[in-house]
Amino acid sequence: MTAIVLACVSAALFGAMTVLVRRALVTGVPPAAGTFLTIVPACAITGIVAGARGNWDVAAAWPYVLAGLLAPGIAQILFTFAVRDAGASRTSVTVGTAPLFAVATALVFLDEPLVAGLIVGAALIVTGGVVLASDRARPEHFLRIGLVYALIGTIAFATRDTVIRWLGTEVADAEPGVAAFVAMLTGTAVSLAFLAWTRTPLGRRAAIAFVPAGVCYGLSYVFLFEAFARGRVSVVSPIVATESLWGVLLSWLVLRKSEHVGRRLVLGAVLVVAGGVLIGVYR
């Protein structure tokens, strides 16, 4: 029961992070700055949690640098651009397709078995994606390039999940909290490098605007790792897959006027989440 609650909280916090990133971007903060300012508080939180456990064997967690390069590094940059251009709700639904890409890479590189549940889950996700693409009730700020950013970022998220799965079973034997901190610290370095490359300025008002999103992001990671530590993957993963629904629900509650959350968007989210749940159960 504890693992279920922790997984639900993690999913809800990730959905809240998406909405809070959108609210902060409305103030005019560039996505490059927004990415960095979201990851820094999250990195601090994961570091505090890892330190509180007293296990600082960072050497054992060095392979997770690769995972951090993918996400939150590259993926979070694309995610922030997607939220700016496509909106929080539509980005949430797109990110919800990550299990489809995770299964695809796992089938190819990890030789995981293909079962009927995975096929049905993949079909539901694809159907949800088609419904989302056919949704014409889009907000004024919507740009199609935002969905492209979201899709590429989702592939990075999914590849990260496969890498972590491989590292955790074949290579590294690191404490989960330290592994999360190393991945988040790497993501911070990537976002800082992108910030310097684009010569994007930082401001005090921008930093304050993104603190809530960063806190939600960091806590989401903490609760996620706690859930996996206390429960089976087959129980936790399907619940975590509901983060897309949380993103749509919170967008409707908080950003109702600007997001235009309609029936097609909700239907697409439900189909994508249902597919993600099936994939989580049958993996």
Per-range role (PLM):
Residues 1-66, 76-86, 134-149, 170-172, ...:
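Membrane-interface interhelical linkers
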Residues 8, 12, 36-40, 65, ...:
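Residue-level signature of the transmembrane alpha-helical core
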Residues 15-19, 47, 69-73, 77, ...:
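Hydrophobic/small/kink-forming positions within alpha-helical transmembrane segments
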Residues 40-46, 101-107, 117-135, 262-283:
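Hydrophobic transmembrane alpha-helices of multi-pass small-molecule transport proteins
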Residues 66-76, 80-129, 178-185, 232-253:
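Specific alpha-helical transmembrane segments that line the substrate/conduction pathway
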Residues 145-169, 177:
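Selected transmembrane alpha-helices and immediately adjacent juxtamembrane segments
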Residues 218, 229-233:
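Intrinsically disordered, low-complexity segments enriched in Gly and acidic/Ser/Thr residues
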